[in-house]
Amino acid sequence: MKRKFNVLIVDDEFLARKLLSEYVSKVDFLQLIDTCSDATKAMEVINEEHIDILLLDIQMPDISGMEMLKLMNNKPAVILTTAYSEYAVDAFALGVVDYLLKPFDYARFLQAVNKAVNTISTETQSDAVNDYLMVK
């Protein structure tokens, strides 16, 4: 059975959440866990559920996406969603895997998701090797 990657979408815009949800539903190896309109609720979901990929908006009413990145202890693979490309450089410094510019494009979404999955797979393999070496 093929592994499914758990996805959380965080964006204060309903239409953005809806479109990204539709994109996620089209990809057979992705599973939508939840959508959140604010960072506070998203942090609760991240603490309660195993999230592999986080689609995170930069500008939200309660806590910005950038601040949320700083607050997260165990970070999933983060794909930033923004209308402002100038935030991307700072976001990469905080460990973001990729970013999507609004308005969203499905082909670009697939590229970002594949990059996130590759990052997760590489980290998983690296952890397995490290665990093996620790035993030896």
Predicted regions and their residues:
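Receiver (REC) domain active-site loop signature in two-component systems and cognate sites
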Residues: 58-60
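Active-site beta3 strand of CheY-like receiver
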Residues: 49-55
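Conserved binding/recognition cores within well-folded domains
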Residues: 117-136
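Conserved sequence signature across two-component system core domains
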Residues: 10-11, 36, 54
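A Lys-centered signature of the CheY-like receiver
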Residues: 102
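Two-component/phosphorelay signaling modules centered on CheY-like receiver
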Residues: 2, 14-34
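Helix N-cap/capping motif at the beta->alpha junctions
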Residues: 35-44, 65
